[in-house]
Swiss-Prot record:
The lineage of its organism: Bacteria, Pseudomonadati, Pseudomonadota, Betaproteobacteria, Burkholderiales. Residues 1-23 form the signal peptide. Belongs to the glycosyl hydrolase 28 family. It comes from Ralstonia nicotianae (strain ATCC BAA-1114 / GMI1000). The gene is pglA. It catalyses: (1,4-alpha-D-galacturonosyl)n+m + H2O = (1,4-alpha-D-galacturonosyl)n + (1,4-alpha-D-galacturonosyl)m. This is Polygalacturonase.
Amino acid sequence: MILSHRYTLIALAAAILSSGAHAAGASVTASWGNVAEPSLPADSAVCKTLAATITPVSGSIDTVDGNPSNSQPDASRIQTAIDNCPAGQAVRLVKGSAGESGFLSGSLKLKSGVTLWIDTGVTLFASRNPADFDNGVGTCGTATTSNTKSCNALIVARDTVGSGIVGDGIIDGRGGSLVTSGPNANRLTWWDIAYLNKTKGLNQQNPRLVQLYNGSAFTLYRVTVQNSPNFHIVTTGTAGVTAWGIKIVTPSLAYTVPGYKCAAGTTPDKVTPATCFTPETVKNTDGFDPGQSTNVVLANSYISTGDDHVAIKASGGATRNLLFAHNHFYYGHGLSIGSETDGGVSNMQVTDLAMDGNDSSGGNGLRIKSDISRGGKVNNIVYNGICMRNVKEPLVFDPFYSTAKGSLYPNFTNIVVKNFHDLGSAKGIARTMTFLGYEAKKRTNPLTLTLDNVVFDGTQPAFDVAHNGGPASPNGTHFTFGGNGPVSFANAIVTSSTTDVTVTGTPGTAAAVDCSNAFVPLKSVAPTSPI
């Protein structure tokens, strides 16, 4: 009976997302089969329509909820609509009769088979009252010495089957707004609190925006997610996640200026409360983080944020079968695996990725990171068709991510980078690469890496220096040249039995990947973007 109910919910969810008039018919091919583009629900599949009552001004509603007693006026009616909605139907948030476009809520819980549809021009704003997210620990909205998490996410889906969040509207976490209760009330923004991790080594207790716990068949479609106080979208133990056409923009124009050209002395590294934010100063704002999850797709999406664009994690459980197809990344710390890999990460494909890092000081490209406190097997990872520019560290394979101690040894094997073209830096910033296996403490876990048609324009990147107790790069790396295309830095690789660096094969002569049409301005698809 339980299994029958589970598959009924999946079927109902499939019906709601395929019966509308917006189906595009596109699909991507994953290792486990074709994955079709979702669609918006049909009008007949809407169980409840809720109209907005708040009018934002320049993307802000801070004048509405200065009094914490009015911090989540829409939470009850949205939650009631979700609770009363039958499986296979959607709750739709729309504009009000006079053009009102804002909803304001604390933490919400999705249920199985129900889709939250945020309509075009509508924004679901998160409360800035930490009490609306506190999970009972009592420290949400502060920075603590304890790493115990104390905030619920804005939207939580726990053990759901066939749920989703769709629409051309926005979910806004308001990370740059002052919190309104607790010891930091009217003193610090969420992002100021997060910056205390850097300045004082404290753990910020800030809410995420979307958090999945277990469950299956979850859909994110076309929605914009921005200004999260912490991570934007996290899946934990979820089987089957499709994120298609989403946009992650942090900070948005509501909290910065065009081009992120903040005036001196206005950012959280210089003043609190800060009045202007850049990607470099909004800490721990990962974009899309699949953890301990399987059959995950991120396709045709756009991400610009202050931390990892993507962080694939495997903490205590495996993550496998992932596809990243036709995506555009901007500011951020890379398409990352790790740092938690002890459960194992395997079978991941990245195809047709454009990365424009805007010469950010913390910019990373393709990245696998771990250390002996949380390391494990990372195997069968293929990056194919990558266009990159203005990224400080384009290729990073690093098992010495930190100096933490332990006996969980990183092991990166069967990594393939092919049809990769880096156009260099508009500002002439020097690039570095890291190629390291874990060969220490009587362990020999070489990085096994195939390079084929990997081309850097201009001055070739340098190899990274020794850090965190590890050796200088390259070390413990077994290179294979695929033979179809060139490897522009091949002559810089020195084989040595001392460093356990080997090379098999020879580069080919195929033309570099054509990146002339790869890059698009983020604001052309996400109007709230400053770039």
